[in-house]
Amino acid sequence: MQRREFLKNSAILGSVALFGGALNLNANSQNLKGEAMKFITLNDGNKIPILGYGVYQIPQNDTQRCVEDAISVGYRSIDTAQAYQNELGVGAAVNSAIKGGIKREEFFITTKIWVSNATESGVLRSFEASMKKLGLDYLDLLLLHQPYNDVYGAWRAMSRLKNEGRIKSIGVSNFYPDRLVDFAINNEIKPAVNQIELNPFHQRKFDREIAKKYGIAVQSWASFGEGRNDMFNNPILKKIGEKYGKTVAQTILRYLIQLDIIVIPKTTRKERMVENFSVFDFELDANDMQTIADIDEQTSLFNDFNHLDPKTVEMLNGWKLPD
């Protein structure tokens, strides 16, 4: 199916939900079509929806509207970060939904500690600031955004907050296998999640194997590679999608979901939120799974942002969040 055709159809569906009163805001873990969500059980026993909504690069003044749209579609897992500078909008949307009847426990809210706050005292201080912006009593998942600064001191503070019940789960982001293994071995509480770049052209098989060995769930950022490599027009992905009457975006998300990879696609358009959520009514067969596995180029689509490059490390350490 062409994405344009799907967007036309889903725009109609979205309008019905917005103006026709057909949406059940209390429908737990279902989208507009009533398709059931799948959950991943983390190593601490907590459960995270395998499909969530990411707000990276969404301006603060547009975040509340986008998250409200996502919630109306059926998303309950929302991924933000201190560095995104839009926690206020996320919190406003989530709290509005709670006042509207959705239970707090239906949501799974994630934020991340930025590099400049990645110290023991920095975590404690910045966590309180994030929670004030989010307007929540507890957080479902707190991640270290980057593997830099005093990550062990930061982890001690995160572990303390988890033990106090302020955070349900703690994890990391952008940790390469060597750092992840060292972190898992030398901390009493292992990361529950490692959020990394992962898409059809950069599938990180070795990273996934290491994470599985240590019981750490893998979460994908940039599942669509921000459209790089002309991903949405890839003939292999298009052909597979057409077989199931699905778009390339849906095919990618379904592929990752069947690998038990948590996905958090971002879009500001409600019809695409619907599109991205409509991935639980089909299943890729083994041949199609292997075909997509074979297009892996085993290289990042963001080589201008290489976490192993000293210049990138200098840049990320030098970037301070505004007060």
Where are these regions (language model features)?
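Active-site mouth loops of central-metabolism enzymes
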Residues: L51-Q60, I113-T119
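CE4/NodB-like, metal-dependent polysaccharide N-deacetylase domain
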Residues: V123-L143, R160-E164
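Short, acidic/polar
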Residues: P59-A70, T119-K133
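Beta/alpha (TIM)-barrel catalytic core signal, keyed to glycine-rich beta->alpha loops juxtaposed to Asp/Glu
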Residues: Q146-D323
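C-terminal segment of N-terminal export signals and the immediately downstream linker at the start
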Residues: A22-P49
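Glycine-centered flexible beta-alpha turn that most often forms the glycine-rich phosphate-binding loop
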Residues: Y53, I78, L139, I170
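N-terminal export signals
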Residues: E5-N26
